[in-house]
């Protein structure tokens, strides 16, 4: 994954905030980054996590672009207002969460936005961490045309009936039969949200329907082990997971 470039080759990147059509045609903000130079590039939709549409997702978008992907992260919280990322995420939680239908619609809009670019190769993947991991799986099941999906420790994929809400009226696992693209799952064995037992249950459902998936579980890692700005960060496990993400997207979006 690292240092896969020649020291004399051109490298450049454009990163900016754009406006794109989201769910039901709503105009929403999104953070877009893309490589400059020759070539047609695959696209990736990054779905924000529970802490908000934050700096981590901007940095992660640029990391993907450094490796040759057009990356876009839609502001799924924008309908709750504008301000500091954590404030908007808190507003969403207080209101019962961002409705699944809204997030799925925003992801579909982001996918179409990427495909409309003249430098797109036409293939688009989706990835998210935490609640964004759950939404990544949902989008892969409900949005036609996604080519690959990564679920990073998405909680509430497995949910009891009493845990469902007006914003999340259907357990994500109940859409498994409709999954129409390869899925990569990354989980920490010390996590409780999702717990190893919930990951097992999700895997059982994927096997039941004969889906194309790979799950990796990391000992000594809990929720958010990618987050280098938190105490949850586990460098060894995080770097292995990053390598698996780039291998997975490389296989399904570049060929």
For each predicted feature, which ranges?
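N-terminal cap/leader regions of alpha/beta-hydrolase-fold enzymes
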Residues: 1-255
């Amino acid at each position: 994954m690292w240092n896969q470039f020649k020291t004399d080759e051109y490298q450049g990147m454009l990163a900016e905030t754009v406006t794109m059509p989201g769910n039901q045609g709503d105009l929403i903000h999104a953070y877009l980054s893309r490589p400059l130079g020759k070539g047609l590039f695959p696209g990736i939709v990054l779905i924000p996590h529970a802490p908000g549409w934050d700096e981590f997702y901007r940095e992660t978008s640029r990391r993907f672009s450094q490796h040759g992907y057009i990356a876009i992260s839609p502001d799924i919280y924008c309908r709750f207002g504008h301000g500091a990322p954590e404030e908007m995420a808190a507003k969403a939680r207080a209101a019962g969460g961002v409705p699944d239908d809204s997030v799925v619609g925003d992801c579909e809009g982001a996918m179409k936005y990427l495909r409309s670019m003249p430098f797109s190769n036409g293939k688009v993947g989706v990835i998210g961490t935490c609640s964004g991991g759950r939404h990544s799986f949902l989008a892969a099941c409900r949005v036609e045309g996604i080519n690959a999906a990564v679920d990073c420790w998405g909680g509430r994929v497995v949910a009891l009936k009493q845990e469902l809400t007006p914003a999340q009226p259907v357990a994500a696992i109940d859409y498994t039969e409709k999954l129409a693209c390869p899925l990569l799952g990354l989980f920490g064995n010390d996590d409780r949200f999702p717990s190893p037992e919930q990951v097992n249950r999700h895997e059982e459902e994927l096997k039941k329907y004969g889906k194309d998936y790979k799950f990796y579980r990391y000992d000594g890692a809990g929720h958010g082990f990618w987050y280098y700005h938190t105490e949850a960060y586990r460098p060894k496990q995080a770097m292995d997971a990053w390598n698996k993400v780039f291998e997975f997207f490389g296989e399904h979006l570049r060929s």
